[in-house]
Amino acid sequence: MSRVPAHFLGRAVALGTIAGGVIAVDQWTKSWALHNLSSTSPRHILGPVYLVLSFNRGAAFSLGSGVSPVIEALASLLAVAVIAFSGRAARIGASPVVVVGLGLLSGGALSNLADRLFGDHHGAVVDFIQAVSWWPTFNVADAAITTGAVTVAVSLFFFSRPKAAHPDQR
């Protein structure tokens, strides 16, 4: 029986904890929004930020809202792909920054997918944050997905180290 490398366990636990935290916070804030917000009376928070209840049948930031069944299928595939990639990244020893980004991305994807599949909103995701008037409403999961994707991209682009050449290739 082979042992699981400690770096994999640590990264897997960190990734799972971050993803679980995102899911918990996102689902709690969506529940709060459903019980406390209206779609017709935005609640001013600070500066250009308002809270207003909306239901998004599209992808993040309401993209593709007219093709809900396609979005549901793509969201499901994307969530599975992100989780598979996250597991692989943890297994091969991805940097802690990449693990954090993947945890945010995984948690956001899974939470929005849970909304689509198990929520009472006919395949829609609950959105409630309006940062500026010209930008679509979003939720904590959307923010986590965006932050996670940017974190992973920046980390891989700016901080990834090239692999050392094999001695025979020098």
Question: What is the predicted function of each stretch?
Answer:
Residues 1-170:
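Alpha-helical transmembrane bundles and membrane-interface segments of multipass inner-membrane proteins
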